[in-house]
Amino acid sequence: IRVPDFVPKEIPSSVRRVLADIEVTSNEGGPAIEPHWGEPGLTLAEKVFGWCNLEVLAFECGNPKAPVNAIPPRAWARMQLRFVVGVDTDALLPALRRHLDRHGFAHVRIGPSRDDMFIATRMDPDHPYVQFAVDSLTRTYGAKPAILPNLGGSLPNDIFTEVLGLTTIWVPHSYPACSQHAPNEHVPVTIVEEGIRLMAGLYWDIGEGLPKV
């Protein structure tokens, strides 16, 4: 990403530390992960969960239904920025405008889409509630859970953290091959049973008392 306003200034050390234990792999039977994808110099986990990514959702040039052997007069693209905490969303379009103008593309028009935007949120992995949840799940499951400071997708978590001022910890119950948002989306019964045990243990420990913050 060439526009500085499109990325955070850095990845916090606490985030880097927990992401060092995360291994991002492709699903069985799925496409291989492109080794050159994402920001150079970052690990694959840091690229997904600690940095921003600019995607081309759709692109059209000329008339696809009636292509001709000529340079088309116009092109159109729908872009999407997957961003993390530390990016000022109000500064995105002005920064892109300056970037295009500086490189001789003042004639290119830009504008926001009509889609809603989720504000990025992140729980500090060093927060006492995070360690409380990790300890509880470890006791119940018998192994330490993976810790993600935030997800790589879109969630309306800002409603809880920014509007209501709450501390949030998500405990998902799924697995990589669940085909989420795709045909045959599913979850094995064993994972549901495991999730019930984990949450029962977590709520039991919460009832025993939370750490003071």
What are these language model-derived features?
Residues 79:
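Active-site helix-to-loop segments that bind/position phosphate- or nucleotide-bearing substrates
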